[in-house]
């Protein structure tokens, strides 16, 4: 396929190299490419591209409407190419990966010069990307893979340092609030670092910012973020990977057989993402919490890359697996989360509340037991409770996970009749925003509205203004 022929508009996408960023970008790319008026260049590291190749539908692979483009990061003895991803990356190497990504700006400029796309869609962690695009007269818009709640809460103190957040209906618990803000509401040093990164990326976006969210969840935050940025903020979510090919996910057969033997909505899926590795103490509290809950569970345990010695038995309390018996299935490394959440016997998701996992839980109508760990996750956990689709397992005054709270939260969500409201609200999310929602999303009308081959900042803003108007109709 010649991307430059006819009226095809070329878009280059540059996500951060974490799964929680790659997959929403890929879903956006797939949706746009199906319009047949767009050719997508999907730019990332070699190891990241290898990870997403199996998730490309055969129809897209055959017509080459999404073309994978390698971004070469500088390698070093501590950060060889196979570690150019956050998936399983040891936490002490994360700063080196961020620095290597920044150092790839020169190679990215060569890519832009060679491909000359009509538009760049970039991620929240690359303030240098729109600068490179601007130097080549290529308009760039930001796509945030997290929600408007966290973005607006983080940016508010910078714009209005002496006033409270105006639309808050939930308050961060003491442990998390102390991490990001001082007693008078000002940002801490950690909070300032996050705010500076976000502001640099969002304010340089051409007239519009895309967010992987939807109005029924975050209307007031989306509108307030638009005020803070003085830009249109367009929700294009929920963008969640939807597996639809039989045999696509290896290892699911044994998991499905196990799930098939359980009662409807009787099982929780436990996962803390691909980037966070709970400490020994945290693992024990979570394990004992699961044991005390007396609920069936599938738990995915992940270990950092290069850790070939850790075993499931070593990571868990002595005798835990024997005591759990048939209630438990523990999987090392990876499990097909979307397929498990879709199964009729799954009744809850015990999650770190990464935005992507949270969207998946909502998309498949599964209530969430939130156990946030860091970054945007405390904000997301608060939003889960505010939306009524889950509960947060409260930590103690020192910020430590409590087994009793984990067990209590699981029981509330899965068993207790008094929290049928949570289960009902989660099911409503599935009905409104399940697997068919994004095909109905107004983003799918991109091709009908986008008329200009090489848009300027102004035309990009006008186009997305139409998207917002259609969203509200």
UniProtKB/Swiss-Prot annotation:
UDP-alpha-D-glucose binds at residues 274, 337, 355-357, 360, 376-377. Pfam families: UDPGT. It comes from the Eukaryota. Highly expressed in mature fruits. Pathway: Secondary metabolite biosynthesis; terpenoid biosynthesis. It catalyses: mogroside IIE + UDP-alpha-D-glucose = mogroside IIIX + UDP + H(+); mogroside III + UDP-alpha-D-glucose = siamenoside I + UDP + H(+). Its EC number is 2.4.1.-. Belongs to the UDP-glycosyltransferase family. UDP-glycosyltransferase involved in the biosynthesis of cucurbitacin and mogroside tetracyclic triterpene natural products (e.g. siamenoside I and mogrosides IV, V and VI). Cucurbitacins have cytotoxic properties and exhibit deterrent taste as a defense barrier against herbivores. Mogrosides are nonsugar highly oxygenated compounds used as high-intensity zero-calorie sweeteners; they also possess pharmacological properties such as regulating immunity, lowering blood sugar and lipid levels, protecting the liver, and acting as antioxidants and antitumor agents. This is Mogroside IIIx synthase. It comes from Siraitia grosvenorii (Monk's fruit).
């Amino acid at each position: 396929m010649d991307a430059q022929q006819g009226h095809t508009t070329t878009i280059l996408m540059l996500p951060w190299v974490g799964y929680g960023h790659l997959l929403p970008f890929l879903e956006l790319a797939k949706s746009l490419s199906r319009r047949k008026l767009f050719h997508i260049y999907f730019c990332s590291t070699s190891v990241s591209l290898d990870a997403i190749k199996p998730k490309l539908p055969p129809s897209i692979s055959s017509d080459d409407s999404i073309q994978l483009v390698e971004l070469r990061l500088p390698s070093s003895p501590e950060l060889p190419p196979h570690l150019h991803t956050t998936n399983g990356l040891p936490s002490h190497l994360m700063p080196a990966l961020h620095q290597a990504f920044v150092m790839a700006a020169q190679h990215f400029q060569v890519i832009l010069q060679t491909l000359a796309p009509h538009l760049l869609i970039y991620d929240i962690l690359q303030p240098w990307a729109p600068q490179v695009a601007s130097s080549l007269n290529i308009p760039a818009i930001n796509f945030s893979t997290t929600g408007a709640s966290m973005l607006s809460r983080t940016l508010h103190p910078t714009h209005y340092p002496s006033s409270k957040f105006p639309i808050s209906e939930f308050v961060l618990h003491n442990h998390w609030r102390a991490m990001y803000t001082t007693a008078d509401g000002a940002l801490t040093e950690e909070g300032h670092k996050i705010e500076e990164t976000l502001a640099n990326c969002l304010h340089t976006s051409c007239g519009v910012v895309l967010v992987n969210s939807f109005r029924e969840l975050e209307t007031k935050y989306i509108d307030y973020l638009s005020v803070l940025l003085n830009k249109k903020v367009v929700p294009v979510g929920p963008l969640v990977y939807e597996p639809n090919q039989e045999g696509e996910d290896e290892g699911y057969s044994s998991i499905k057989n196990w799930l098939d033997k359980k009662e409807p909505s009787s099982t929780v899926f436990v996962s803390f993402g691909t980037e966070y590795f709970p400490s020994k103490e945290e693992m024990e509290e979570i394990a004992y919490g699961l044991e005390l809950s007396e609920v069936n569970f599938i738990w995915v345990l992940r270990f950092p890359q290069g850790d070939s010695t850790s075993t499931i038995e070593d990571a868990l309390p002595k005798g835990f697996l024997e005591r759990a018996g048939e209630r438990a299935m523990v999987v090392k490394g990876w499990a097909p989360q979307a397929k498990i959440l879709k199964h009729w016997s799954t009744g809850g998701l015990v999650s770190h509340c990464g935005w992507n996992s949270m969207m998946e839980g909502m998309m498949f109508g599964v209530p969430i037991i939130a156990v946030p760990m860091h970054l945007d996750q405390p904000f997301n956990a608060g939003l889960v409770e505010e939306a009524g689709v889950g509960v947060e397992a409260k930590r103690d005054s020192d910020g430590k996970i409590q087994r009793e709270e984990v067990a209590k939260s699981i029981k509330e969500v899965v068993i207790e009749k008094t929290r049928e409201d949570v289960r009902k609200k989660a099911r409503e999310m599935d009905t409104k925003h399940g697997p068919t929602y994004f095909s109905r999303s107004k983003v799918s009308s991109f091709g009908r509205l986008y008329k200009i081959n090489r848009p300027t900042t102004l035309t990009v803003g006008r186009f997305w203004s139409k998207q917002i108007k259609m969203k509200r109709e």
